[in-house]
Amino acid sequence: MTDRQTDTAPSPSAHLLAGGLPTVDAAASREEPKPAPGGGVEGVGARGIARKLFVQLLGSSRSVVAVVCAAGDKPIGAGRSASSGLEKPGPEKRGEEEKEEERGPQWALGSQEPSSWTGEAAVCADSAPAARAPQAPARASVPEGRGARQGAQESGLPRSPSRRGSASRAGPGRASETMNFLLSWVHWTLALLLYLHHAKWSQAAPTTEGEQKSHEVIKFMDVYQRSYCRPIETLVDIFQEYPDEIEYIFKPSCVPLMRCAGCCNDEALECVPTSESNITMQIMRIKPHQSQHIGEMSFLQHSRCECRPKKDRTKPEKKSVRGKGKGQKRKRKKSRFKSWSVHCEPCSERRKHLFVQDPQTCKCSCKNTDSRCKARQLELNERTCRCDKPRR
């Protein structure tokens, strides 16, 4: 091989900077570097290859790495002479190499900051020694001739033993930092995925206590105890308790009271109160267009209840013994009026206290009069017998 062929041969660093990372066999990566015939070390070495594979796995942009490394490196054949093709190291390059060896493994790997983990600086540091590595075999092959120099160039990427040792000391530390970061990143990603998966399922199939109770079957004993005759809270209309106070509007119009309610075991029995008590509540009384105030009103409550036989309300009255005197005549007249009033239907089921019924004709009339409603600037509603606001 001639001098021109050796000068024009592609350098390994140029191939690396072009973007193509080397692919290494698994068996070759476990082999130890072999000594070259012209001196130096043959091959890149297992640790250098592993470092390049880590950079490739991290997915760093090869174009950015190539630009960064090309900006900082010089051509490989810049120091060679045109006539002989041998590299002239010079005193300046030797001084720079000695300074780099004194700086330590971190400068050899090109790490600038402790937080730089992308591995781009490591590739640049590997390419720079690879470009300067042919200096040792070139210097060693001068007395042996061109054959030894050609064998040293064909052996791959030779490196000096001192530089290989510094790289081997710094490589595991850099790789461990990268692996720690990758593991932590994977752990956080898995935790986030598990949280999102759990949140998705919880929204898709919500389970509440109300839905579970809606499908629950209530047992027979619970139904029996709840429906049996007992005092239970009931909403009672105030007008039902105070039928004479028709000039007021009450707020609220009904109050919660404990009243006897429920079922008995026999249809001939009914639930009736056996113990009663009074309770006082504050109710707002409103006189339309006049005044309103909060007053106290007393209501009747049931404390205890029992099932007792029903009273026969349709039972005919016993005939009174005929006798002489005015008292007997009055009783007979009252009984006649009662018998006649039985056939009359009630005027209203809800507001009986607002109507007056004639027992003979069963005609209903209002207790309120039109003049009484006009005195309050209201109008009498004959259908409901209440004083309502005038319509405009």
Swiss-Prot record:
Instruction: Indicate what this protein is called per its UniProt record.
Output: Vascular endothelial growth factor A, long form
Any idea which UniProt keywords this protein has?
A: Angiogenesis, Cell membrane, Cytoplasm, Developmental protein, Differentiation, Disulfide bond, Endoplasmic reticulum, Extracellular matrix, Glycoprotein, Golgi apparatus, Growth factor, Heparin-binding, Membrane, Mitogen, Nucleus, Secreted
Question: Quick one: where's region Disordered?
Answer: 1-44, 73-174, 309-337
Low complexity: which segments have biased composition? Answer: 121-143, 158-174
SMART domains cross-referenced by the UniProt entry: PDGF
Residues annotated as glycosylated are N278
Per the UniProt record, the lineage of the source organism begins with:
Eukaryota, Metazoa, Chordata, Craniata, Vertebrata
Mark out the compositionally biased spans (Basic and acidic residues).
89-104, 309-320
Under Pfam families, the record lists: PDGF, VEGF_C
GO biological process terms held by the UniProt record: angiogenesis; apoptotic process; artery morphogenesis; blood vessel development; blood vessel morphogenesis; bone trabecula formation; bone trabecula morphogenesis; branching involved in blood vessel morphogenesis
Q: List the disulfide bonds.
A: C229-C271, C260-C305, C264-C307
> From start to end residue, where is composition biased (Basic residues)?
321-337
Q: Which GO terms describe its cellular component?
A: adherens junction; cell surface; cytoplasm; endoplasmic reticulum; extracellular region; extracellular space; Golgi apparatus; nucleus
- Asked if the record carries the keyword Disulfide bond, the reply is yes
UniProt induction comment: By IL-6 and FSH in vitro.
Name one molecular function that GO assigns to this entry: vascular endothelial growth factor receptor 2 binding
Q: PANTHER family, per this entry? A: VASCULAR ENDOTHELIAL GROWTH FACTOR, VASCULAR ENDOTHELIAL GROWTH FACTOR A, LONG FORM
What is the similarity comment for this entry? Belongs to the PDGF/VEGF growth factor family.
Q: Which domain of life is it from?
A: Eukaryota
Q: In which tissues is it expressed?
A: In developing embryos, expressed mainly in the choroid plexus, paraventricular neuroepithelium, placenta and kidney glomeruli. Also found in bronchial epithelium, adrenal gland and in seminiferous tubules of testis. High expression continues in kidney glomeruli and choroid plexus in adults.
